[in-house]
Design a protein with these regions (language model features):
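Ligand-binding pockets and gating/stacking loops
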Residues: 1-172
Length: 172
């Protein structure tokens, strides 16, 4: 099974679980994050590659181009699943209107193992609890846990702290 097929099958299972109310929370790991794990993406790489190793070669334009292609691939997969959720009617809106679907990474600069300024994309409206269509730039040093805490609060779970959170982000 190719990586895109795998992501779409896992996404379809996630959507089915949401539609049948089997769960309200799901995670899809689109690629292995273990060091040295071979990554094969049909049409992108001729043979399996070491994604982790590639991130340490960002100074090489050829490697950087491959990494950018891989990022584009993940955005395409995310978008495909978002469009499926947008097409599913649910109550007065759609499945996407009533949920939050997040794409992110655990590292912002793989060559230096930097885990701040993490690019994160949220699709959906959480039943009106978040305002879509915006770019939010947090202050330097803001932990990603602030986003997770804010998302949990948007889902109706009223807690004040999560991991190393230092506050909440304004999502609405």
């Amino acid at each position: 099974m190719t990586r895109d097929e795998f992501i779409q099958v896992m996404g379809d299972l996630m959507i089915l679980a949401f539609r049948t109310d089997l769960t309200r929370v799901a995670t899809i790991m689109s690629s292995p994050e273990r060091w040295g794990s071979p990554l094969k993406v049909h049409g992108l790489f001729d043979k399996p590659v070491d994604h982790h190793g590639m991130t340490h070669g960002q100074g090489n334009q050829h490697v950087r181009s491959k990494l950018e292609s891989l990022d584009h691939f993940h955005i395409q997969q995310f978008t495909s699943l978002v469009m499926k959720m947008k097409d599913i009617k649910e109550g007065e809106g759609t499945l996407l209107d009533n949920m939050m679907f997040t794409l992110g990474s655990g590292i912002s600069d793989g060559s230096l193992h930097i885990y701040t300024d993490l690019p994160t994309l949220i699709a959906g409206g959480a039943g009106g609890a978040i305002k879509p269509g915006r770019h939010i730039k947090s202050q330097n040093g803001t932990p990603i846990a602030n986003l997770w805490l804010s998302m949990i609060n948007a889902m109706g779970v009223n807690i004040d702290q999560l991991g190393d959170s230092t506050g909440k982000l304004k999502l609405s």
